[in-house]
Amino acid sequence: MHQQSPVDDVTALNSSALTMSEYPEGESPLQLQDVDSSRVGGHILSPIFNSSSPSLPVESHPVCIQSPYTDLGHDFTTLPFYSPALLGYGTSPLSECSSVRQSLSPTLFWPPHSQVSSLALHQQHTRLQQNHPTGGTWTELTPHDHSEEEYRKPLVKRVADAEETSTSLRGKADMHYCAVCSDYASGYHYGVWSCEGCKAFFKRSIQGHNDYICPATNQCTIDKNRRKSCQACRLRKCYEVGMMKCGLRRDRGSYQQRGAQQKRLARFSGRMRTSGPRSQEMKSVPCPLSGNEVVNMALTPEELIARIMDAEPPEIYLMKDMKKPFTEANVMMSLTNLADKELVHMISWAKKVPGFVELSLFDQVHLLECCWLEVLMLGLMWRSVNHPGKLIFSPDLSLSRDEGSCVQGFVEIFDMLLAATSRFRELKLQREEYVCLKAMILLNSNMCLSSSEGGEELQRRSKLLCLLDSVTDALVWAISKTGLSFQQRSTRLAHLLMLLSHIRHLSNKGMDHLHCMKMKKMVPLYDLLLEMLDAHIMHGSRLSHSGPAPKESTGVQEATLSVLKNDL
C-alpha cells in the first residue's frame, strides 16, 4: 500500500476543509490551475529558484481557496506568484540561487496586470462576502488602472530604510547626512549639516571644556557607531568639516519647521515683487523678516563655492605679438585692450554669483562701477602667484618690473602688485579662497551707495549684507578645509581680509594713473573701459562733496546698463 506523505496529508486536509466551507448563494471558489511548464514528474519547481533541493509533490486535482475579494467590480487578470523582473534578478542564471526561501510571501512578487502566468487566480462575477476575515499573507488588491508602483510598494518598503514623513517625496529629496558622523542630519547647525548629537557635542565643546586628548594617534574613525569613542578626534573632525561658532545657521530647525518658514518667505517675496512703484525695476531677494530670522539663499558654503567657481570667466588672450623693446604707448594699448575684454566677462561673472542678479539694477551697476579694477587686479595676482617677479596679464602677455618701467608712473603700482602677489604666495592661496575673496570684493564695494537712512535704502542694504555674510561663511568654510588649527584658521582669515584693503588702495592708485593717461591723451580708451573710468571719477567727486547718489541712471552708466540688461 502506498504510504501518503505528510505533505499530501496537509494538502488534502486544506483542500477538504476549504471545499467543505459554506458559500453564500451565487458565489464560486477560486481555483489554482495546473502548471504544465514547471511540472517535472508530478512535482512543481519554482519559476524563480532552480535549486538542487527536493521539490514538493502536489496533488493533481485543483485546490479551491475561498476568496475574500468577491464582487469588487474589477476584472482581475492573472497574477503570478513569482516574477524575476519584479525582483530585479535580470538575466542572471537561475542556478545561482542555492535554496528556496520558504518564508517569502507570494504577495511580494505580484507584478502588474499586463503580465500573464500559467499559475493564476481567476475571479468571476461574484459579490463581496460579508464579515469574512481577510487573514493570512494575502494583501488588498487594487483596481487595474493603478500604476506599477502601487504593486511595488511592499517590496520597496522591505528594501528601503528611510524615515516616514507626511511629505515623503519632498523629505527624501531634502535628506541630508551629518558631515561629522554620517548619521541623518536634523538640520543645518554651526555652518554644516549635522545630527543632534554632533550639534550638541560641538556646542558643549565651544562653550566649556574642550581640552580633549586622543589616546591614540589623532586619527580615530568618527562615524555613527564610533563617534563617542574619542572626543578629541570628534572635535577635530567638526572643525575639519567646517563647523564654526560664528557660522550663520542656515535652514535652522527640523525639516517641517523649515518647510513652514519657506512658505512664509514665498508669501513675503510675492508681496515684494507685486507692490511698490519700482517693482518692475527692483527684483526681490530674501531679506530679513524680523530681527532674529535671517533669510538667505539656502545654499551651503560648499554649494556656494561650487557655484562661484563654475562662474569663473575664461582666460583672455591679447592675440597679438608685442615687439621689443616695449614702449609706453605699446604697453598701455595692450593693457587697456585686455582690460576692456575682461570687463565684458567680469559683468557676466558677477551675474552668476548667487544672489547678485536679485539685487536692484541700480545696485548691480554701482557695485560693478566701484569694484571693477579691484576684481581685475585680484585676478592678475592669482595668475601671477606662481611666477615670482612677473605679472601675468594674459597667457600671451607677461611683464617683469624692468619691462613695465617704460610706462611713466607705473613702477610704483607694479611694485605694489608684486608685493601683494608675493603675500598671496606666502599664504599658499587656494582656489576656493580666491573665488570667495573675489566675490567679497564685488559685494563689499558699496562706498558709492547712498548713505540715507530711508526704509527702502535700509532694505536694499540688508539684502546686500545678507549675500556678503553668505560669502564670508563660505570663505571661513574654505579655510577650515586646510586642516589648520582653530587659532591658525583665525589668523589666516585675518591675513586674507587685510589684503583686501591693500587691493583697494592699489585700485585707487591704478585708477588715478589711468585717468592721468586719459587726460594726457597718451592712449585711447575703449567704450566700456572709458565708461567705467568716468563713473569711478564721478562717484569719487560726489563723495568728496558729500552729495547723495541719485537713483536714476546717468549717461555715464549707459554702457554698463546695456550689458546688464541684455542678460536680465
From Swiss-Prot:
Region (Modulating): 1-177
InterPro entries in the record: ER-beta-like_N (IPR021064), ER-beta/gamma (IPR028355), Est_rcpt/est-rel_rcp (IPR024178), NHR-like_dom_sf (IPR035500), Nucl_hrmn_rcpt_lig-bd (IPR000536), Nuclear_hormone_rcpt_NR3 (IPR050200), Nuclear_hrmn_rcpt (IPR001723), Znf_hrmn_rcpt (IPR001628)
Subcellular location: Nucleus
Coiled coil region boundaries: none
Annotated keywords: DNA-binding, Lipid-binding, Metal-binding, Nucleus, Receptor, Steroid-binding, Transcription, Transcription regulation, Zinc, Zinc-finger
Residue ranges for the DNA-binding region feature of this UniProt entry: 178-243
Annotated GO MF terms: nuclear estrogen receptor activity; sequence-specific DNA binding; steroid binding; steroid hormone binding; zinc ion binding
Signal peptide limits: none
Domain NR LBD per the UniProt entry, residue ranges: 300-536
Zinc finger (NR C4-type): 178-198, 214-238
Pfam families assigned to the protein according to its UniProt record, in alphabetical order: ERbeta_N, Hormone_recep, zf-C4
Gene Ontology biological process terms, A to Z: cellular response to estradiol stimulus; estrogen receptor signaling pathway; response to estradiol
Domain of life: Eukaryota
Family: Belongs to the nuclear hormone receptor family. NR3 subfamily.
The protein's role, per its UniProt record: Binds estrogens with an affinity similar to that of ER-alpha, and activates expression of reporter genes containing estrogen response elements (ERE) in an estrogen-dependent manner.
Assembly: Binds DNA as a homodimer. Can form a heterodimer with ER-alpha.
Comment text on domains: Composed of three domains: a modulating N-terminal domain, a DNA-binding domain and a C-terminal ligand-binding domain.
Entry protein name: Estrogen receptor beta
Organism: Oncorhynchus mykiss
Gene (UniProt): esr2
